[in-house]
Amino acid sequence: MTLNLAAKKAVVEEVTAVASKAISAVVADYRGLTVNQMTQLRSEARKSGVYLRVVRNTLTRRALKNTEFECLNDLLVGPVFIALSLEAPSDAARLLKDYAKTFEKLEIRALSVGGKVYNANQIDAVASLPTRDEAISKLMYVMKAPIEKFVRTLAEPHAKLARTLAAVKDKKAGNPA
């Protein structure tokens, strides 16, 4: 389907706007995927907060110009789509890694975070990063542990005294423990 000049400019503006807000980007080859598989992938991407778009490579290059994902331009060859993570750096990587296991024809080419390109072999490291909520909960657990230990240490002498008094009371009552 050919696009007129106004439609092409609109696509470039849309992708540029999303790319300027994105945290990471993944480029993948979708050759061999069926329409149903692509529809399922797009649906999951929407749920995950990932912007997934199939755009002509020349338009994608123009859209990524002057963004931190300009480094992906050399990889925009053949039928590829771009997935942009808007909430967490690992969202798009995790989504496409899971789908690459299910649909073997999906080939992840590269990932870009912070202006650096990582190849498909390194995507596992980014995909395994915790989400923001998971990271906050782990941090809170680590911060809470020393305080809990301190509170237990402060409470132990009182608890020991209470147990000793209970044992003395039971012994005087004739019920040896």
UniProtKB/Swiss-Prot annotation:
Keyword rRNA-binding: yes
Family of this protein: Belongs to the universal ribosomal protein uL10 family.
Species lineage: Bacteria, Pseudomonadati, Pseudomonadota, Gammaproteobacteria, Legionellales
Alphabetical list of InterPro entries matching this protein: Ribosomal_uL10 (IPR001790), Ribosomal_uL10-like_sf (IPR043141), Ribosomal_uL10_bac (IPR022973), Ribosomal_uL10_bac_type (IPR047865), Ribosomal_uL10_CS_bac (IPR002363)
GO terms assigned for molecular function: large ribosomal subunit rRNA binding; structural constituent of ribosome
PANTHER family: 39S RIBOSOMAL PROTEIN L10, MITOCHONDRIAL (PTHR11560)
Pfam families referenced in this protein's UniProt entry, alphabetically: Ribosomal_L10
NCBIfam families reported in the protein's UniProt record: PRK00099.1-1
Protein keywords: Ribonucleoprotein, Ribosomal protein, RNA-binding, rRNA-binding
Protein name: Large ribosomal subunit protein uL10
Function, as annotated: Forms part of the ribosomal stalk, playing a central role in the interaction of the ribosome with GTP-bound translation factors.
Keyword Phosphoprotein belongs to the record: no
GO cellular component terms, semicolon-separated: large ribosomal subunit
Subunit structure: Part of the ribosomal stalk of the 50S ribosomal subunit. The N-terminus interacts with L11 and the large rRNA to form the base of the stalk. The C-terminus forms an elongated spine to which L12 dimers bind in a sequential fashion forming a multimeric L10(L12)X complex.
CDD domains listed in its UniProt record: Ribosomal_L10
GO BP field: translation
